[in-house]
Amino acid sequence: MPTKKNNFEEQLNSLEKIVTNLENGNVPLEDALKEFQEGVKISRELDKKLTSAEEIVAKLIDSDGTEHKLDPNNAAAPED
């Protein structure tokens, strides 16, 4: 079961396995419901991570295309 410590790729891999299991239809109903719930949880966590990454990229590149250096001490805010 993925935890918040897992990286994006590990969580994505777990979600893909859940989807494959559910698509195959060889999972008992109770297990399918548990897997579905876990898949929704993972999907939401991945969405948060993607949104955060998009915000960082948006901060690094202004609307006019000007790029900014990323401050390694504060990944959420670019250096001016």
UniProtKB/Swiss-Prot annotation:
Q: What is its main location?
A: cytoplasm
Q: Name one GO biological process term.
A: DNA catabolic process
Please state the Enzyme Commission number of this protein. Answer: 3.1.11.6
Concerning InterPro entries, the annotation shows: Exonuc_VII_S, Exonuc_VII_ssu_sf
Localization in the cell? Cytoplasm
The domain of life is Bacteria
Q: Which reaction does it catalyse?
A: Exonucleolytic cleavage in either 5'- to 3'- or 3'- to 5'-direction to yield nucleoside 5'-phosphates
> What are the coiled-coil residue ranges?
none
Q: Which GO CC annotations does the UniProt entry carry?
A: cytosol; exodeoxyribonuclease VII complex
Question: What are the UniProt keywords, alphabetically?
Answer: Cytoplasm, Exonuclease, Hydrolase, Nuclease
Tell whether Ligase is among the UniProt keywords: no
An example of a GO molecular function for this protein is:
exodeoxyribonuclease VII activity
Using the UniProt record, name the top-level EC class of this enzyme in a single word: hydrolase
The record's section on Pfam families has: Exonuc_VII_S
Could you describe the subunit structure of this protein?
Heterooligomer composed of large and small subunits.
| Family named by the database record | Belongs to the XseB family.
- Described function: Bidirectionally degrades single-stranded DNA into large acid-insoluble oligonucleotides, which are then degraded further into small acid-soluble oligonucleotides.
- The molecule here is called Exodeoxyribonuclease 7 small subunit
Lineage at the top is: Bacteria, Bacillati, Bacillota, Bacilli, Lactobacillales
- Gene transcribed to yield this protein: xseB
